[in-house]
């Protein structure tokens, strides 16, 4: 269902100059919550941007009726520190510092240099490039340095 929602709202969000990072539908305290997270290629995602996107996609979602039950729409930035789960997440996080944990228990910190549909390239501290297929990644999380 979230894939259908993504397909419906992604073009609208891009027409406003922003990028759709993720869509998730969760249940918290008996409430269905539709979370839409954004990236602003020109800077931060402000509260005004979240409100603008929410006001535009809310009626669109109501008309499409993808979610049968009542839900709460939350629009937010993708966040400074987040787990990368899909090739799209990796592609939208290029150039960011990440902590990588592999399925073989190896871990390292690096800069995410490139990503495609099946693997990601990481620049290590010694400037060597390490290519890893997604199937070999256990967890990749962006790191924000203060």
Curated annotation (Swiss-Prot):
What UniProt keywords are attached to this protein's entry? Cytoplasm, Ribosome biogenesis
UniProt signal peptide: none
The record's Gene3D superfamilies line, in alphabetical order, gives: RimP-like superfamily, N-terminal
> Is Cytoplasm one of the keywords UniProt gives this record?
yes
Q: Which InterPro entries does the protein's record reference?
A: Ribosome_maturation_RimP, RimP_C, RimP_C_sf, RimP_N, RimP_N_sf
GO cellular-component terms in the record?
cytosol
Which SUPFAM superfamilies is this protein grouped with? YhbC-like, C-terminal domain, YhbC-like, N-terminal domain
Q: Name one GO biological process term.
A: ribosomal small subunit assembly
Q: Which Pfam families match?
A: DUF150_C, RimP_N
Subcellular location field:
Cytoplasm
Question: PANTHER family attached here?
Answer: RIBOSOME MATURATION FACTOR RIMP
The function of this protein is: Required for maturation of 30S ribosomal subunits.
Q: Which family does it belong to?
A: Belongs to the RimP family.
- The protein, known as: Ribosome maturation factor RimP
Question: Whose protein is this, by species?
Answer: Helicobacter pylori (strain P12)
Q: Which gene encodes it?
A: rimP
């Amino acid at each position: 269902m979230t894939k259908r929602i993504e397909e419906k709202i992604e073009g609208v969000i891009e027409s406003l100059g922003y990028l759709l990072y993720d869509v998730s539908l969760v249940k918290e305290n008996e409430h269905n919550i539709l979370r839409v997270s954004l990236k602003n290629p020109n800077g931060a995602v402000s509260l005004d941007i979240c409100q603008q996107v929410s006001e535009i996609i809310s009626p669109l979602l109501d008309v499409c009726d993808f979610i049968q039950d009542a839900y709460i729409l939350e629009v937010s930035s993708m966040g400074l520190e987040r787990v990368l789960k899909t090739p799209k997440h990796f592609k939208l996080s290029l150039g960011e510092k990440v902590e990588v944990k592999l399925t073989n228990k190896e871990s390292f910190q690096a800069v995410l240099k490139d990503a495609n549909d099946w693997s990601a390239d990481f620049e290590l501290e010694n400037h060597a490039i390490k290519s890893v297929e997604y199937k070999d990644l256990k967890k990749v999380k962006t790191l924000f340095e203060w």
